[in-house]
Amino acid sequence: MQKTYDAHDIRFDIPADWQGNFLAEYQQHGEGDTAYEATVFSCHIGQNDVMVMTIAAFGEKQWETIKASSPDAAKMEFATSKDGKTHYTLRIEDQKMDTEADQKVYDTIRAAAQSLSGKITITK
């Protein structure tokens, strides 16, 4: 049965390779013009929880600040809120594991994250 992640204005079908091995952590960062919210998605591999992807949400003022300071920001943007005031970015991590077996697991989980491109819905 397909499970859905639906929290903090983000919705997507959880990839089969993540089922039963999935942690989403909501975080708030910074203040003022640098404040933003992020949801970090991790999976357990070996003895560690390993970050797989991050979806961040930036208000208009914060978005302009981030775009000015990071040339990659615009490339990572995948959606805006319905009112156009919140900008969402998607970052797929590229971690290196200590063992070949753990790396194969990570690569499978990362590929599942990449398959979400274009399938993540912003609900607000």
Residue ranges, per PLM feature:
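Secretory pathway targeting signatures of secreted, lumenal, and periplasmic proteins
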Residues: 2, 7, 13-61
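Solvent-exposed, polar/charged alpha-helical surfaces in well-ordered, non-transmembrane soluble domains
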Residues: 12, 16, 111-114
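Short, isolated positions in well-ordered beta-strands
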Residues: 12, 87-88
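Short acidic, gly/pro-rich beta-turn/loop elements at beta-sheet edges
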Residues: 22, 65, 99-100
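Short, Gly/Ser/Thr-enriched beta-strand-loop segments that form substrate-interacting elements
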Residues: 57-74
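Short, surface-exposed beta-strand/loop micro-motifs that present aromatic residues
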Residues: 73-82
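Surface-exposed amphipathic alpha-helical segments
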Residues: 90-124
